[in-house]
C-alpha cells in the first residue's frame, strides 16, 4: 500500500505541531535554567548582601526548576497527544474512505450505548460506561458499526482510620458488531483464555467445545448450544486465522455469533503502531495502522458467514 502523498501531508502537519511543541518546551527549559542559576548563586557569591536568608534563594530556585521541568513534560505530553489524535482522525478518514467506498459515518465524540454491547450476553453491568469513536457503514446488505468503550467498575474499602475509599477498575477496548441479512439459530462464543477482568462472564447453558488443534484449545475457549454448529463455523482455517489475528493485536479477543449478529470485542486493546510527534512518519507505520483498522473486516471475511452453505436449505443452520 503506497500512500506517498498522504505521508507528505501528515509529515508536514507533524513538523508544524513539533515546532510549536519545541517552542513551548524551550520556554519551559529557560525557566528551569533560571532556577538552576539561582540555585548556584550562593555558592559563587553571586548574591546581594541584602539576602541574609539563603533559604529564600533556594526556595525560589527549586520552584523555578520544578515548574520548568513539569511544564516540559506537560507540553511534550499535550502536543504529542494532540498530534496522535489528529493523525488518528486523518488516518481513519483516509483509510475508511478506502475500505468503505459506498459510504460510512465516523464521529470521534459519539459512541455506542451499553445496551448495544450487552446484546452479546457476556457483559456484567459496569458502574460507569464511556464510549467514543463511533463508526457505521453498510456494504452489500451488511451493516457494520463500532466504537471504543471503557467499562468501569467501582471497588470500595475502608482504611485503618475508618475512612471509606473508592478505586476504579477500567476495562477499555474496541467493539464491533456486524448485522447480516439472515439469522443463525444458534449462539456461539469464542473467548481468548485468561481474558480476565470482571467485565465479562460466560453464557448460561452453553456447552464448552474442544477442537482437534491443541494450540487453538490452549488459547481459546469456545461455547455453543450446538457442537455441530461450532464445528461448522470454526473450520481449521478459521482457527488458524483467529490465532494469527490474536498474534497481530495487543488485546483480549472475544467473538460472539448470535441470531443475525457477529460481535467482536478487543478488550484492553493497545495499538502496535508507534506514532510519535518526534519521529518521522514512514510507509511501515501507515501499513501497520491500515492493517489494525481493517482487522474487524478481516475477521468477518475469515469466518465467511455469507458463504453459500449457510443459505442451502439442506442445512438447518
Protein language model annotation of sequence segments:
Residues 15-18, 69-95:
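Transmembrane-cytosolic junction motif
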Residues 37-45, 150-159:
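Short regulatory "switch" loops immediately downstream of catalytic or recognition motifs
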Amino acid at each position: 500500500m503506497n500512500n506517498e502523498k498522504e505521508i507528505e501531508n501528515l509529515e508536514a502537519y507533524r513538523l508544524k505541531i513539533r515546532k510549536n511543541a519545541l517552542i513551548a518546551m524551550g520556554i519551559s527549559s529557560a525557566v528551569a535554567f533560571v532556577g538552576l542559576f539561582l540555585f548556584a548563586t550562593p555558592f559563587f557569591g553571586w548574591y546581594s548582601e541584602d539576602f541574609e536568608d539563603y533559604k529564600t534563594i533556594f526556595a525560589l530556585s527549586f520552584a523555578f526548576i520544578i515548574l520548568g521541568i513539569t511544564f516540559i513534560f506537560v507540553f511534550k505530553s499535550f502536543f504529542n497527544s494532540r498530534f496522535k489524535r489528529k493523525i488518528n482522525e486523518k488516518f481513519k478518514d483516509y483509510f475508511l474512505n478506502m475500505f468503505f467506498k459506498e459510504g460510512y459515518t465516523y464521529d470521534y465524540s459519539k459512541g455506542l450505548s451499553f445496551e448495544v454491547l450487552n446484546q452479546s450476553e457476556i457483559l456484567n453491568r459496569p458502574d460507569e460506561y464511556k464510549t467514543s469513536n463511533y463508526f457505521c457503514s453498510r456494504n452489500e446488505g451488511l451493516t457494520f458499526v463500532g466504537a471504543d468503550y471503557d467499562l468501569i467498575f467501582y471497588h470500595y474499602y475502608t482504611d485503618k482510620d475508618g475512612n471509606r475509599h473508592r478505586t476504579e477498575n477500567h476495562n477499555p477496548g474496541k467493539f464491533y458488531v456486524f448485522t447480516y441479512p439472515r439469522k443463525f439459530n444458534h449462539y456461539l462464543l469464542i473467548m481468548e483464555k485468561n481474558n480476565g477482568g470482571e467485565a465479562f462472564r460466560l453464557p448460561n447453558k452453553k456447552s464448552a467445545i474442544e477442537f482437534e488443534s491443541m494450540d487453538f484449545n490452549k488459547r481459546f475457549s469456545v461455547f455453543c448450544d450446538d457442537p455441530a454448529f461450532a464445528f461448522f463455523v470454526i473450520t481449521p482455517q478459521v482457527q488458524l486465522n483467529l490465532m494469527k489475528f490474536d498474534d497481530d493485536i495487543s488485546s483480549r479477543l472475544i467473538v460472539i455469533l448470535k441470531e443475525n449478529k457477529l460481535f467482536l470485542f478487543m478488550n484492553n486493546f493497545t495499538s502496535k503502531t508507534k506514532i510519535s510527534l518526534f519521529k518521522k512518519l514512514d510507509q511501515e507505520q501507515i501499513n501497520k495502522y491500515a492493517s489494525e483498522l481493517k482487522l474487524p473486516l478481516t475477521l468477518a471475511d475469515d469466518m465467511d458467514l455469507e458463504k453459500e452453505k449457510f443459505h442451502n436449505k439442506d442445512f438447518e443452520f
